[in-house]
């Protein structure tokens, strides 16, 4: 089934235009500054080590003030210490409008459901939230097109997950690039371009979030266990996820497809 969905970002799910009209590099720089600001504020707010939802909400609200962002904080039930972020979406099927109503943060909560169990997962997911708010049009454009191309959703979802998963010790980047290229080549060129653009955005925000989490872990080292945890995450990020290498490949593949698309369009009008 195919749709012709248009998207609409609701007022409380975005920042005003003056906050996001800069170039990508400038927006990314501001997002990094906001992440540092949140880290400093929440660390100061939670000097007793209790990262309660009420304190987290206070710091997030202050971070984006005077703008009011609609978001929820939920318990992540998948596995200990894991976290995730999702869109709060609603669809008006009659008008065929996809509404982006806000952001849902999923964090590892303690049994009392009022405190975060791992503050570094919090830092990681809040960086995702910041990145999404400073790149709202990119985010909605990707969602919009993927819904309109529902017939390929299983394939595009699989490819996206393939890029985000750890690379097995038995698999090197050369093998990854070949398998990824084979998967992308199955798609029609326009869908492949859209998928790679989504993957590129996803990889960039993962690089940002992991870089922040690693930096804050090393900054907070108080004993040998803290050092080992920070080092293990850094090694896993560099050796297993290889997000920077994947981003280079995605950009190269995307550029090649865009070149083919431009040549095809030129040929049509010659």
Spans of model-derived segments:
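Non-Sec secretion/translocation targeting segments of pathogen effectors
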Residues: 1-14, 18, 209, 267-270
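Zn2+-dependent metallopeptidase catalytic core
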Residues: 27, 34, 43-68
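Active-site scaffold of zinc-dependent metalloenzymes
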Residues: 76-119, 126-133
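Short, charged/polar micro-motifs that form catalytic or ligand-binding hotspots
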Residues: 112-116, 120-121, 195, 199, ...
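Post-HEXXH active-site segment of zinc metalloproteases
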Residues: 116, 132-186, 194
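Acidic-residue sensor for enzyme active/binding pockets
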Residues: 117, 125, 150, 206, ...
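Sec/Tat-exported extracytoplasmic proteins
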Residues: 130, 134, 217-220
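Pan-zinc metallopeptidase signature
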Residues: 177-201, 206-270
């Amino acid at each position: 089934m195919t749709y012709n969905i248009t998207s609409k970002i609701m007022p409380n799910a975005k920042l005003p235009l003056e906050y996001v009209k800069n170039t990508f590099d400038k927006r990314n720089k501001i997002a990094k500054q906001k992440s540092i600001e949140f880290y400093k504020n929440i660390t100061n707010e939670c000097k007793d080590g209790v990262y309660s939802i009420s304190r987290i909400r206070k710091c997030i609200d202050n971070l984006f003030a005077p703008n009011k962002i609609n978001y929820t904080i939920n318990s992540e039930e998948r596995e200990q210490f894991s976290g995730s972020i999702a869109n709060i979406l609603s669809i008006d099927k009659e008008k065929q409008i996809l509404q982006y109503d806000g952001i849902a943060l999923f964090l590892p909560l303690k049994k009392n459901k009022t405190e975060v169990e791992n503050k570094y997962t919090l830092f990681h997911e809040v960086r995702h939230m910041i990145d999404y708010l400073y790149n709202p049009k990119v985010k909605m454009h990707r969602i919009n097109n993927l819904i309109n191309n529902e017939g390929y959703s299983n394939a595009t979802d699989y490819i996206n997950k393939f890029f985000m998963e750890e690379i097995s010790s038995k698999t090197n980047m050369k093998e990854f690039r070949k398998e990824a290229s084979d998967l992308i080549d199955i798609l029609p060129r326009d869908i492949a371009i859209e998928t790679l653009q989504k993957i590129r955005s996803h990889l960039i925000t993962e690089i940002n979030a992991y870089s922040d989490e690693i930096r804050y872990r090393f900054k907070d080292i108080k004993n040998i266990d803290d050092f080992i945890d920070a080092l293990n995450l850094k090694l896993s990020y560099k050796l297993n996820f290889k997000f920077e290498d994947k981003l280079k490949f995605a950009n190269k593949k995307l550029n090649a497809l865009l070149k083919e698309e431009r040549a095809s369009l030129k040929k049509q009008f010659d």
